[in-house]
């Protein structure tokens, strides 16, 4: 399969971003699914950048870090620090939220996870960014994301 990701893959920076927080619950991807992704990434020389703002996102980070000790938190109070860290990353997996759109705007390769939102209105515009769209976020099986990650040279 050709998902159109950048050909240089992740070898240049070895960091991936998990953008998980959203202003609406129905746009959030289930924690257990994120854990499956983090567990899959345990076998690779990758750091997982987890943006954190508030207690819920801090708890999310702690759960991911239990599964994959390479996960690190990025405080999101300072936009310049966010951009500086995102510039060190090669790839993102994110729900429909502002930080995911920032990743996309910075030109990172990645996967947008869409539930109730219409990606044709707010989705990515670059060929190296892909969308998984289901009516409910719980319908996005982590195995589909893992399949796409394999195309990004994770295996």
Segments (PLM) and residue ranges:
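Short glycine-centered, acidic/aromatic-flanked micro-motifs in structured strand/loop junctions
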Residues: 20, 50-52, 134
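Short, Lys/Arg-enriched, disordered terminal segments
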Residues: 8-13, 43, 147-155
């Amino acid at each position: 399969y050709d998902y159109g990701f950048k050909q240089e893959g992740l070898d240049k920076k070895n960091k991936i971003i998990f953008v998980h927080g959203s202003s609406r619950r129905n746009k959030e991807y289930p924690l257990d699914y994120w854990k499956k992704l983090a567990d899959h990434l345990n076998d690779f020389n990758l750091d997982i950048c987890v943006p954190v703002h508030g207690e819920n996102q801090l708890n999310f980070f702690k759960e991911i870090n239990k599964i994959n000790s390479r996960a690190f938190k990025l405080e999101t109070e300072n936009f310049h620090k966010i951009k500086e860290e995102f510039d060190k990353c090669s790839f993102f997996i994110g729900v429909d939220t502002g930080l995911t759109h920032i990743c996309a705007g910075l030109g990172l390769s990645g996967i947008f996870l869409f539930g109730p939102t219409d990606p044709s209105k707010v989705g990515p515009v670059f060929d190296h960014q892909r969308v998984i769209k289901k009516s409910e976020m719980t319908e996005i099986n982590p195995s589909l994301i893992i399949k796409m990650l394999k195309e990004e040279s994770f295996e």
